[in-house]
Amino acid sequence: MSIRNIGIMAHIDAGKTTTTERIIYYTGKSHKIGDVDSGNTITDWMPQEQERGITISSAAITCHWKDCQINIIDTPGHVDFTAEVERSLRVLDGGVVIFSAVDGIQAQTETVWKQSEKYEIPRLAYINKMDRLGANFFKVVGDIENKFKTIPLILQIPIGNESNFEGVVDIILNKELHFAMENGIPKLTYSPIREEFAEKVGFFKKKLIDILSQFSEEITQLFLEDKEISLDIIKSEIRRGTISRFIIPVLMGTSLKNIGIEPLIDSIVDYLPSPFEKNFSAFSLDANKKILVNPNENKKLSALVFKVQYSSVIAAHLYFVRVYSGEINSSKKIFNASNGKREKFTKIFRVFSNKNEQIDCVKTGDIGAVLGLKFSFTGDTLVEENNNVLLESVTFPEPVVLMSVEPERSSDEVRLREIFGIISKEDPTFSYYESKETGQLIISGMGELHLEIILTRIKDEFNLNVYTGKPQVSYRESAGKIVKEVFEFNNIFAGKNIDFKIGMIIKPLPRGEGNKIDFECDINPTIKSAIFRGITTAFVSGVFGYPIIDINVGIFSIVSETSKISESAFESISGFAFHSIFQKSDPIKLEPIMLLEIRTPIEHTGEIISKFNVMGGVIHSVSNIGEYDLIKSEAAFEKLFGYASILRSSTKGRGSFTMEFSYFKEKVG
């Protein structure tokens, strides 16, 4: 059976979950249609999701259409949960990007588009909410072309618009598609194209052939010879153009009213790639270089852990895996190539949102979940022994908001730490630590909503009440200048007198470069590894108590007058040395700058811009969508606490905004 691993991506409220619920219904996986407003969707199964009507965790669903197995991941649209999108995209072969026919391209749409570009994911575009006031299919298509510098391939034209939208004309099939409820069951019917649509269909059919002929010699030849271009050839070339990311097929519908779903599922099967149509990149530990590997069931196992999810029912973590070669089964001896630990699968599951069906194996190209892993995390590579490859891992954005947390009862502090450990294992953008100054437990995340959801989980899922402080900005720090020095340690460590010198040079790097450690002298590999760990650990907290970023540390000399220094001593002393030298680099504090997209009624635009300027924000652009203006801007994160209340007050509750982290900037004053 053929497989499609696809993601459903969009801005919040564009209709991701509603569309996914319809796909689940039409493929026969569910006998009722879940509704976001009613809180009974299959994919949004967490209590916090059903209560808020948003997707928080990327739910995995397996369903079938015709002769194809479709693994669907419905991803969050809120920027606070962008890590869920990132780790899902890493294992997808194709995607459906949903656009609102009214709002067009929105902030998170741009974010997920960029993320999917990074992973070179072929996509379909589905323009939803065609029945809404202000819906404009062709404007959104134009925006996709201009904003994303891609070639949209229109496969359908609308029958009616806004409240009169009733179906589509399929340009390839030359048929009208109508969608109606019959005895309470959605039913698709086909009819010949009416004369009123003939000219428009002819125009877009010619445009479709023109686009395909740009990369298809076969279609070009048939066109020049004035021969018929068969349906099979057209669909085959659309598929080829989609997989090569030369084109983006565009469909439409209104998912809430069950219009456009079956053609969308057909297009997922017809145009998006199977796992066997693309080689995957890996790092060969034997050859010490990147390689391309062909997916093959007969090869040894290589799989990626792309998500870890805690189940309070079984009090254990469930590990979601994508298999790139070989197969997962409980008899295999497994090795975690990322950390060198041996692992074992105890149970294997086919996933259906929050419900699991136990199975015997997960084969090449498929997605499943396993129990039994003890030392694995998101982004780790699982292999059979002697298959020395590392798959490309998953990278995540920096947390930008902090909050102090303490249990109502001091006796619960150990349990609270355990809960934080459980959550941080499943959510790489959540972290916690103990403040050196106050002794308080500090949690950090992607935004206020992110931390709010986690605190709700602690109360509802783990039955623990906590006190919290006000949200604070998660600053960073970096070196202000180059400093070069030899640090001398002559003291007792672990009961032994140690005389040790280490020379370091610390240089500031451009923003976004990350931290680098270079060894400019010959060092024993064991000592080198210990020093690397010591300095890396020291990056966690600098002079101001914040993580250190964007510096280069060069080790240019090591002199030891003491024999047989332990690894732990090298590790600890290297950390001391780094902190001592870093203090002399004129450290600077960095604050997060956020990108905002503010949606406001036109009559309030002037007031919104004025107040935003007073806050020290910068306006990048203002564009109009019907009765609303979209203001794209940026501001320091510390100025944005409480901005939702300011916006609601200024717009009489009609305004809204989204924001995402952009970059770190030196904080002045």
From Swiss-Prot:
Q: Subcellular location, in the record's words?
A: Cytoplasm
**Keyword Cytoplasm in annotation:** yes
Query: Which residues are in the tr-type G domain?
Result: 1-276
Pfam families for this protein: EF-G_D2, EFG_C, EFG_III, EFG_IV, GTP_EFTU
Which keywords, in A-to-Z order, does the entry hold?
A: Cytoplasm, Elongation factor, GTP-binding, Nucleotide-binding, Protein biosynthesis
Q: What does the entry list under GO cellular component?
A: cytoplasm
Q: What is its main location?
A: cytoplasm
Q: Gene3D superfamilies, per this entry?
A: 3.30.230.10, 3.30.70.240, Elongation Factor G (Translational Gtpase), domain 3 (3.30.70.870), P-loop containing nucleotide triphosphate hydrolases (3.40.50.300), Translation factors (2.40.30.10)
GO MF terms listed in the record are: GTP binding; GTPase activity; translation elongation factor activity
UniProt key word Protein biosynthesis? yes
Instruction: Spell out the InterPro entries in the cross-references.
Output: EF-G-like_DII, EFG_II, EFG_III, EFG_III/V, EFG_V, EFG_V-like, G_TR_CS, P-loop_NTPase
Annotated GTP binding lies at 10-17, 74-78, 128-131
| Record-level GO BP terms | ribosome disassembly
Q: Report the family membership.
A: Belongs to the TRAFAC class translation factor GTPase superfamily. Classic translation factor GTPase family. EF-G/EF-2 subfamily.
Functional note: Catalyzes the GTP-dependent ribosomal translocation step during translation elongation. During this step, the ribosome changes from the pre-translocational (PRE) to the post-translocational (POST) state as the newly formed A-site-bound peptidyl-tRNA and P-site-bound deacylated tRNA move to the P and E sites, respectively. Catalyzes the coordinated movement of the two tRNA molecules, the mRNA and conformational changes in the ribosome.
Q: HAMAP family, from UniProt?
A: EF_G_EF_2_B
Name of the featured protein: Elongation factor G 2
Q: Which organism is it from?
A: Borrelia garinii subsp. bavariensis (strain ATCC BAA-2496 / DSM 23469 / PBi)
